[in-house]
């Protein structure tokens, strides 16, 4: 299985998890010239921009580097501008390891 297919499977799994947690999925794989946002979801009137990372033999969170956060932040700014979003938002990470999901909210504050 190639990495693109694994990524799509992880995002599908993440969407199921997020819906079960009360999120409404607004968009998937939003592409901007600055980068890609895996999932954009809404919960409690807050827009969540979610980066999905998965892995079995390592800690997937370590793939979210300062450079990646910078690219995501630019893509989020572009999305907010083009969609005229003025409500609260945050950048989250959804980590999938060994079939378990962990949502880490506001990763830019870590």
UniProtKB/Swiss-Prot annotation:
The terms under GO molecular function for this entry are: nucleic acid binding
Q: Name one Pfam family in it.
A: UPF0102
InterPro entries referenced in this protein's UniProt entry, alphabetically = Restrct_endonuc-II-like (IPR011335), tRNA_endonuc-like_dom_sf (IPR011856), UPF0102_YraN-like (IPR003509)
| SUPFAM superfamilies (alphabetical) | Restriction endonuclease-like
Judging by the UniProt lineage, the source's domain of life is: Bacteria
Q: Which family does it belong to?
A: Belongs to the UPF0102 family.
Question: Which PANTHER family does the entry link to?
Answer: UPF0102 PROTEIN YRAN
Q: What is this protein called?
A: UPF0102 protein HH_1751
Q: Which organism is it from?
A: Helicobacter hepaticus (strain ATCC 51449 / 3B1)
Organism classification: Bacteria, Pseudomonadati, Campylobacterota, Epsilonproteobacteria, Campylobacterales
């Amino acid at each position: 299985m190639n990495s693109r297919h694994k990524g799509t499977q992880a995002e599908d799994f993440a969407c199921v998890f997020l819906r079960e947690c009360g999120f409404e999925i607004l968009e998937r794989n939003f592409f901007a010239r600055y980068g890609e946002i895996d999932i954009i979801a809404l919960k409690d009137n807050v827009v969540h921009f979610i980066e999905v990372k998965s892995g079995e033999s390592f800690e997937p969170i370590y793939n979210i580097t300062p450079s990646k956060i910078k690219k995501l932040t630019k893509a989020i700014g572009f999305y907010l501008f083009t969609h005229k979003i003025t409500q609260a938002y945050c950048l989250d990470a959804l980590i999938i390891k060994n079939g378990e999901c962990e949502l880490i909210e506001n990763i830019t504050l870590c």
